[in-house]
């Protein structure tokens, strides 16, 4: 479900995303709604422009937190050790797991993350991801993946967005 904040021009509107029916997450107006590339994605946004644009996806998900973090990290190879970080914070009704990874990204093409298809290596890529884990076991993912420069330039906005569920 996507709602729009009233009283702003369309260029300035922030989007409010429902997270597991427990809280709203406010998406920065600079993150532009985009066509979903997969049916399992609930919301997709474009961050940046042209070839430097990154992809922000949001969806409900299953599996454990540790398994999903391991899978996300496994999609990357190389990268500086100091850029590979995981932190956990409390945000509203969620335990929020933030994950940063850089390096060469193995992007699935055509099959989605669980169904195979061909893989394309994207050099100098980064991801900042968030797993919203609720006490009842529900999980919601937000992932920003793209050229490292774009992801790093928008990391603070992404983290603020994920923590907005606590406001």
PLM region spans:
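Boundary at the C-terminal end of the N-terminal hydrophobic targeting segment
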Residues: 9-14
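Secretory pathway targeting signatures of secreted, lumenal, and periplasmic proteins
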Residues: 26-79
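Surface-exposed amphipathic alpha-helical segments
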Residues: 23-31, 136-167
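Solvent-exposed coil/turn segments that connect beta secondary-structure elements
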Residues: 50, 61-63, 102-106, 136, ...
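Soluble non-cytosolic domains of exported or imported proteins
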Residues: 18, 22, 59-67, 122, ...
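Signature of long, low-cysteine stretches enriched in small and polar/charged residues
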Residues: 70-133
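Extracytoplasmic
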Residues: 20-22, 26-28, 38-42, 51-53, ...
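Hydrophobic h-region of N-terminal signal peptides that target proteins for export
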Residues: 1-7
């Amino acid at each position: 479900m996507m709602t729009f904040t009233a009283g702003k021009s369309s260029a300035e509107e922030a989007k409010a995303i429902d997270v597991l029916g427990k809280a709203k997450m406010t998406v920065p107006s600079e993150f532009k709604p985009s066509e979903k590339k997969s049916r399992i994605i609930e919301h997709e946004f474009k961050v940046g422009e042209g070839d430097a644009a990154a992809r922000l996806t949001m969806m409900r998900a299953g599996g454990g937190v540790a398994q999903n973090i391991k899978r996300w990290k496994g999609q990357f190879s190389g990268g500086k050790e100091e850029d590979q970080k995981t932190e956990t914070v409390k945000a509203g009704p969620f335990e929020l797991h933030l994950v940063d990874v850089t390096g060469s990204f193995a992007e699935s093409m055509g099959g989605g993350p669980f169904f195979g298809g061909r893989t394309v290596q994207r050099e100098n890529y980064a991801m900042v991801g968030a797993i919203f884990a609720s006490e009842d076991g529900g999980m919601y993912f937000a992932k920003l993946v793209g050229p490292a420069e774009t992801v790093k330039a928008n990391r603070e906005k992404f983290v603020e967005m994920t923590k907005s569920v606590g406001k």
